[in-house]
Amino acid sequence: MLSAPGFHHLHLNSVDPAAAIDFYARQFASTSASSWGGLPALASPNNVLLLFSKVATPPATTPQSAIWHFGWHVTDVRKSLGAYKSRPDVKLLPLYTTDEGGSVPISSDTWPPTGSVLGLTRAEIADARAKGVTPKGGSGFAYLQGPDGAIVEYQGNQPVERMNHVHMWQEQPFCAQLWYRKHLNASLVPGRAPASPRTEENCRVERGPDRTWPALVPEGMFRTPTAAVIFGDVMLTWYMRQDDTLLADTRGQLYDHIAFSVADLDAWVAKLRAEGVTFLREPYALGATRAVMIEGPSREAIELVEMKG
């Protein structure tokens, strides 16, 4: 079996890549301006990149595609929040605590979750209120708005500051997990393996009926089912799409595609072609190397970049 790819980059479209890179480098001190394949980039210390293409008009963020936002580990989330509050060019995104109104800047400033789901339903919030449950404070997750309308999560407290995930929507998260494992040899996230292993016969499920909070939208969000895989130390983590509209093609939007590194592109092309995977672009030159682009289970564009040695 071919070795699992590594996470190489998240490709963003931007009206001003240099300004975007400068913004991110100021918010995450461990990162630095770089370039790769002739394109401007932001380098994270775990050897992954945000890669940028310059576009003439602001990139679209609607209709919703499979890519929702990307996230960073930080060592002290409240220290980061304090720094961001002092910077006029940083817009913090509120986490709404109920559909009645009210918001907090960090998830741990509202009622804590009671299980593996990172939020509470209306009924669970009512129960927490009745029992006098109070926020735990401390570490948690929070969001800021990046250039071009990007949503950026910062999560702590973690040992090292680095890019750590791309949060996505999927038509069927369990089926997506199977797809990434079958076609791209992805690993399950340690500690997050499904309690009951899914197969292609039973991976399709109904979306959970209850919205949960905290959430980036006042009406709350559906957090079940959820699934994830990991490439190197970068997770792809998924919730089911939030409405009845099919997810759009990522290409040309703000979050254009995700990219993985492979050692032998020809071997991967042969494997994926034999498995009936959809190719969006046949092998093409990319900087000093080659790449192909395939389509994921919810129309996300996935680039495979050959990185020999």
Residue positions per predicted region:
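Vicinal oxygen chelate
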Residues: 1, 82-168, 187-230, 237-241, ...
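Conserved beta-strand-loop-alpha-helix junction that forms the acyl-donor binding cleft
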Residues: 11-16, 167-172, 196-197
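Short, solvent-exposed cationic patches
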Residues: 171-185
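Extracytoplasmic/secreted envelope proteins and their assembly/folding machinery
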Residues: 17, 21-25, 77, 81, ...
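Post-signal peptide N-terminal segment of secreted/secretory-pathway proteins
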Residues: 56-75, 79-82
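Short, solvent-exposed beta-strand edge segments and adjacent coil->beta transition regions
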Residues: 5-9, 65-69, 161-165, 253-257
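Mature N-terminal segment immediately following signal peptide/propeptide cleavage
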Residues: 2-36
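Helix N-cap motif at beta-to-alpha junctions
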Residues: 15-17, 74-79, 172-173, 262-266
